[in-house]
């Protein structure tokens, strides 16, 4: 069954030393092999693959498969598709030390014989659970299998809720019955979304359609790139709902930074909406804008953290107290967290997911938003069109109803696919980037993996785009030197503000004007190396002292959750003087910094973090959980943030393992963090490789939601 240069137990050590698997992967495989044995009689009677090697051959195969399954989870996949295993090189080594000598179908048949593995197709509902599940040719750890099944079930139930059920669930009076008041609701939608002069007869206002969808469905998934108006759309929706119902509405995002941005965006959208609706003051109740919430929180805070426990206060048996939940940056929500969130929703509640399906998937296992939107990627069989605007999927009945409500003929989007398509809407037009703006053009070309267009954009010479080529010589890397000079120029502003006793919020806002993003964490061109380079350059420029661990102006990023302090992985703060206790700087403080002797008169320094509500959380540096300096951060950690200026650093000669991490989603996410200017330090070959390689996360969620794709 297996031909290898060494026993699998020895190869596991080799693969661990070569970082093809983690120590956890190896220990998991060994533990499973020790605890669970093959039923050899069952295997012999099931298939004719037993030879003179007997049980040992089965054990070797089981050991290898367990290591592969654990590695999949380490790489954020939720399952191991057996048919994707490379039989000639299962671990994808530079030179293979192992081959599997049976077919994929035979592997599946063999795995079904182990007492550690059960299959939904074969087992009865009351059968004892097993640690590993084999489902439709995919291998799962039991808990991830349950997460996936239950998330699919929750979402399907929400999507299948009939429109006629909603008024009662919203506790609205009979005069607000949606079906009976289509004309009145349609008129309000017309006021919220007046037709623009440049809209053609065949154009669709997807913001308006999204609002109508979310108004009539318990589940609404609104996806779109940066600047497409997701927050504007949801603000108008919430205003429309508050016209007809007294609802408890909560706004959340995965991180504190994303929650703060959501709050800011909602506030700004409400101000714009009030101005836009002023001409209709005699026809619409503007006072209900007050009932549109502005304050967003994190998912952890919403669910209720229990210190030193993976569980939350709110769950299936103690649901959240709300009628509508809006989740922004949904692409960042992993499968286990989405399961916890959905299970905590009360039965009557609505859910709105906002996000960009083309961004990087969550840091942990799963790609939930991408799986939910998977059906939108299929070509419409009726129109045979591949243009993005033809990717909606509506059932026949709902298409007709939504057409009447929105005023747009949606019949071209009728599809036989499952009804979850009725809950989805993709926003197309970016209002942040003009049609000829370099950042938007580059992001679009990368997202489409259009090699020729990518090069054309770079060669056009857009003012908001800058390319820095790696030029490595014996004297160093002039490209890296140029990037470090740029970093010093940008970071100078907030560091000088810190010396001048400016307001902490203003200093943090200034710091957030620029960020260096890295594809990798380790290495000279990873977060570790770039942070060290920027620190050295700033010290040489006498902008920081860096003689102590917690120096004035040091940015820190939290690497582990501390529920007692209210700090979570990815939170970013600055080491600044605590002005509330000090009152003011000593007059000689700034000069002492410049002389490199700041400790003499320095006021007490605290780590300052902006909270979702705009307040400042101050923490003694010594109490901070695991953290790092944050002049540079990974692209993954930047999700949910925006910066005026972004510099992306790519490695010069990435290893095979690093190449797997360089994807178009990573580059696209980095580009779209920039609002005004984007710089890339890299080589053409590496940028091209990343832009043409799409992220593939193994999951069965899309199959469960879109059973016909």
PLM ranges: what are they?
Residues 346, 549-552, 568, 638:
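Residue-level recognition of short, solvent-exposed, well-ordered loop/turn junctions
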Residues 184-219:
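Conserved pre-motif I regulatory segment
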Residues 40-56, 96, 123-124, 163-187, ...:
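Intrinsically disordered, low-complexity terminal tails and inter-domain linkers enriched
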Residues 209-211, 215-457:
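ASCE P-loop NTPase helicase motor core
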Residues 98-171, 181-184:
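Interdomain "pre-motor" coupling segment immediately N-terminal to P-loop NTPase/helicase cores
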Residues 358, 362-556, 562-564:
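Conserved helicase motor core of P-loop NTPases
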Residues 1-96:
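Intrinsically disordered, low-complexity N-terminal extensions of AAA+/P-loop NTPases
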Residues 571, 577-578, 582-709:
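C-terminal accessory regions
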């Amino acid at each position: 069954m297996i031909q290898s240069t060494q026993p699998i137990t020895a190869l596991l050590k080799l693969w661990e030393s070569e970082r093809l698997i983690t120590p956890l992967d190896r220990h998991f495989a060994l533990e499973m092999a020790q605890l669970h044995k093959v039923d050899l009689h069952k295997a012999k009677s099931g298939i004719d693959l037993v030879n003179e090697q007997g049980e040992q051959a089965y054990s070797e195969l089981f050991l290898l498969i367990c290591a592969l399954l654990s590695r999949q989870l380490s790489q954020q996949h939720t399952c191991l598709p057996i048919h994707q295993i490379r039989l000639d090189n299962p671990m994808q080594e530079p030179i293979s030390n192992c081959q599997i000598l049976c077919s994929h179908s035979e592997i599946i048949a063999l795995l079904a014989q182990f007492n550690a593995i059960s299959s939904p197709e074969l087992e009865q509902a009351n059968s004892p659970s097993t640690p590993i599940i084999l489902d439709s040719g995919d291998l799962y750890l039991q808990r991830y299998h349950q997460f996936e099944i239950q998330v699919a079930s929750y979402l399907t139930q929400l999507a299948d809720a009939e429109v006629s059920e909603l008024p009662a669930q919203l506790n609205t009076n009979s005069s607000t019955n949606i079906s009976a008041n289509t004309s009145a609701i349609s008129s309000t939608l017309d006021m919220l979304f007046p037709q623009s002069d440049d809209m053609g007869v065949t154009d669709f206002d997807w913001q308006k359609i999204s609002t109508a969808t979310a108004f009539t469905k318990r589940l609404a998934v609104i996806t779109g790139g940066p600047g497409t108006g997701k927050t504007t759309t949801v603000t108008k929706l919430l205003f429309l709902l508050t016209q007809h119902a007294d609802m408890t509405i909560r706004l959340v995002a995965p991180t504190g930074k994303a929650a703060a941005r959501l709050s800011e965006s909602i506030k700004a959208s409400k101000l714009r909406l009030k101005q836009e609706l002023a001409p209709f003051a005699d026809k619409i109740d503007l006072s209900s804008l007050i009932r549109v919430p502005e304050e967003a929180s994190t998912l952890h805070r919403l669910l209720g953290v229990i210190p030193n426990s993976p569980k939350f206060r709110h769950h299936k048996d103690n649901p959240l107290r709300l009628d509508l939940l809006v989740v922004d940056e949904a692409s960042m929500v992993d499968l286990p967290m989405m399961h916890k969130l959905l299970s905590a929703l009360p039965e009557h509640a609505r859910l709105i997911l906002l996000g960009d399906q083309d961004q990087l998937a969550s840091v942990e296992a799963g790609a939930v938003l991408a799986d939910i939107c998977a059906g939108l990627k299929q070509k419409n069989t009726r129109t045979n069109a591949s243009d993005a605007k033809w990717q909606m999927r509506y059932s026949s009945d709902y298409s007709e109803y939504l057409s009447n409500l929105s005023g747009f003929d949606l019949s071209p989007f009728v599809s036989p696919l499952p009804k979850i398509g009725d809950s989805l809407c993709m926003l197309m037009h970016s209002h942040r980037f003009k049609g000829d703006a370099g950042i938007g053009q580059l992001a679009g070309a990368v997202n489409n993996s259009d090699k020729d267009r990518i090069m054309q954009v770079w060669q056009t010479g857009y003012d908001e785009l800058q390319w820095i080529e790696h030029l490595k010589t014996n004297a160093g890397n002039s490209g890296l030197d140029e990037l470090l000079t740029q970093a010093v120029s940008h970071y100078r502003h907030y560091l000088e503000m810190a010396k001048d006793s400016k307001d902490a919020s203003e200093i943090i806002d200034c710091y957030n004007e620029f960020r260096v993003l890295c594809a990798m964490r380790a290495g000279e061109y990873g977060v570790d190396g770039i942070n060290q380079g920027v620190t050295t350059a700033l010290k040489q420029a006498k902008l920081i002292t860096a003689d102590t661990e917690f120096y004035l102006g040091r940015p820190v990023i939290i690497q582990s959750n501390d529920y007692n302090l209210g700090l979570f992985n990815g939170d970013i703060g600055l080491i600044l003087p605590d002005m509330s206790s000090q009152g003011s700087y000593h007059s000689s403080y700034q000069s002492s910094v410049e002389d490199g002797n700041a400790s003499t008169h320095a006021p007490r320094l605290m780590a300052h973090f902006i909270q979702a509500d705009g307040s400042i959380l101050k923490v003694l540096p010594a109490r901070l959980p695991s953290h790092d300096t944050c002049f540079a951060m990974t692209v993954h950690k930047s999700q949910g943030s925006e910066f005026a200026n972004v510099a992306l650093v790519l490695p010069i000669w990435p290893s095979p393992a690093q190449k797997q991490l360089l994807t178009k989603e990573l580059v696209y996410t980095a580009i779209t963090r920039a609002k005004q200017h984007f710089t890339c330090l890299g080589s053409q070959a590496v940028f091209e490789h990343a832009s043409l390689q799409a992220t593939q996360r193994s999951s069965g969620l899309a199959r469960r939601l879109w059973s016909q794709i």
